[in-house]
Every structure is written in C-alpha cells, then in structure tokens.
Curated annotation (Swiss-Prot):
One Gene Ontology term from the biological process aspect of the record: DNA repair
Protein name per Swiss-Prot or TrEMBL: Recombination protein RecR
Zinc finger (C4-type): 57-72
SUPFAM superfamilies the record matches: Recombination protein RecR
InterPro entries for the chain: DNA_Rcmb_RecR (IPR000093), Rcmb_RecR (IPR023627), Rcmb_RecR_Znf (IPR015967), TOPRIM_dom (IPR006171), TOPRIM_RecR (IPR034137)
Gene3D superfamilies: 3.30.60.80, 3.40.1360.10, 6.10.250.240, RecR Domain 1
Gene Ontology MF: a single term: zinc ion binding
Record domain Toprim: where: 80-176
Family: Belongs to the RecR family.
Protein purpose: May play a role in DNA repair. It seems to be involved in an RecBC-independent recombinational process of DNA repair. It may act with RecF and RecO.
Amino acid sequence: MQYPEAIGRLIESFTKLPGIGPKTAVRLAFHVLDMEEDDVLTFAKSLVSAKRDIKYCTVCGHITDIDPCAICKDSHRDETVVCVVQDSRDVIAMEKMREYRGKYHVLHGAISPMEGIGPEDINVSSLLTRLQENESIQEVILATNPNIEGEATSMYLSRLLKPTGIRVTRLAHGLPVGGDLEYADEVTLSRAMEGRREL
C-alpha cells in the first residue's frame, strides 16, 4: 500500500530497529499519529537527546552521560575485580542481580571470524592498558555470551591475560532455574557439571 511520504519515512525508520518488522512498524507509525503532539515531541526529543548526550566511559566503555561513569567513580566498589562483558546491556543485567560489586569492562562486541570481527575490532586494547596501569586489579571475570563468538572471545582473552599473572575466571554456565534436566542440551549439562559447587 502507498502511504503518504511522511508516514512512509516513519515506517521505514521504525523497521531499522531490531525486532521490528514491516507490520509492527506500520502499527507503531499509526500509534504515533494517534498520540498527543506534546507526547510525540517529548519522544522525539528523548531520541535526539539519547543519541547526542550518551557516550562511552573512557575507563570501562559502558554507556554514560558523565565521564568516567558512575560505576567507575564509585569508591565503594571492589577495585580488584573487573568483569568483562560484550555489551552495556550485560552491565545492566549484572547490576540488576545486585550481587557483583566490582568494576566492568565493555568490549562492544565479540570476536567473530565469520563476520570479519577480530580482536582489533573490539575494546581489547583499552582493557590491556587498564590492567597495566592499575596494579590493584587481581581478577578478570570473563562474562561473554555462551555462544561461539563469546567462547572464542573468552578463549582469546584468557590466553592473552594468563601471562600477566592476573587471575582469569569465566562465569559458570548451566541450567536455568525452573528448567528440566531432560530438555537441556549436552553442552549446557556439561557446563553445569563443571560449574558445580559444594553445598
């Protein structure tokens, strides 16, 4: 169907978002038309403001509107542990847990030879610099995703960091709470067995 040009551009803009297909984009566009003008302006300003004002922390690479970020500036956090994650969304997920009190380092991706992404394309060099400059760091927790790219990234970082003498650990992967053993794949079961702990 042919939409007026302004609606067509709005629909096309919505389809650029992850998980938004053409039908959802049309619904969203028409929802915007039904919104109060003040709400639309607030929404538009929020988009522009987020894009303009949010930057990456120069210490850890997490998204922030101040530099360094609030986590890096927090003197109550454990300076001796750095949790390495792929994405700022991973930091947010870890923070929701409210158990980890160390610092973070965001890679902004994972090694993926199939997609042409190597170690030089992610935030590895600043991690090495950070570890060299901060002698108080005693442990690096590798919390990359449990997929091929995340595993490749963890293995690479593990080999790279071992000679530094800093303890390198990997998050345990295993069975989800409420999940049934019979539905778990072999890799998940194997990791759950390896990551078992004393009770």
